[in-house]
Amino acid sequence: MGTAKEKKQQIVAEFKDKLSQAQTVIFSNFSGLTVEDDTILRRKFREANSEYKVYKNTLMTIAAKELGYGDDLIKYFEGPTSVAFGYDDPVAPAKVLVEFMKDHKGIELKAGLVNGKLVTVEEIKALAELPSREELVAKALGSMKAPITNLVFVLSGTLRSLLYALNAVKEKKQAEA
């Protein structure tokens, strides 16, 4: 085990790493959450392939300053602050938090970062309304598949009509013979 200073340096390095890698970072006040609610929330984040952690405000401030963030972000590091990280789907952490807030009053949004840009509570709520990455991919694939499917139906209908016409000509020739 290292000294307390080394542990704090590790935590700062971890937070900096997560802050740099995440597409979405959301800061919230969790002071009204029960242990049971906190456990439920953490499970929801895991299910959404996101992370939810609590760091000391002083360590977050050090990390944010080292990454070049100013007081516009650091001012939110007051009181109990939890952090949600979204790596693959930038919408997932916002969806989880906003959805959770509908049934649990013990948590409130402070601010967030989307691709390194500071966003407000209203912008986080708007982000939560967007479709997830999976939904967008499904819609895109569906819209690409639809014209191909329609083309197959049109071509098979045309081919069927040609076969009927050829069959009619064949039957006419047989009747004449």
Swiss-Prot record:
PROSITE patterns the UniProt entry points to: RIBOSOMAL_L10
Keywords of this entry: Ribonucleoprotein, Ribosomal protein, RNA-binding, rRNA-binding
GO CC entries: large ribosomal subunit
RNA-binding recorded as keyword: yes
InterPro entries, A to Z: Ribosomal_uL10, Ribosomal_uL10-like_sf, Ribosomal_uL10_bac, Ribosomal_uL10_bac_type, Ribosomal_uL10_CS_bac
GO molecular function, one term: large ribosomal subunit rRNA binding
Signal peptide: none
A Pfam family recorded for this sequence: Ribosomal_L10
One of the GO BP terms on file: translation
Record keyword Ubl conjugation present: no
Function: Forms part of the ribosomal stalk, playing a central role in the interaction of the ribosome with GTP-bound translation factors.
Family membership noted in the UniProt record: Belongs to the universal ribosomal protein uL10 family.
Summary of subunit composition and partner proteins: Part of the ribosomal stalk of the 50S ribosomal subunit. The N-terminus interacts with L11 and the large rRNA to form the base of the stalk. The C-terminus forms an elongated spine to which L12 dimers bind in a sequential fashion forming a multimeric L10(L12)X complex.
HAMAP family registered for this protein in UniProt: Ribosomal_uL10
Protein name according to UniProt: Large ribosomal subunit protein uL10
Gene: rplJ
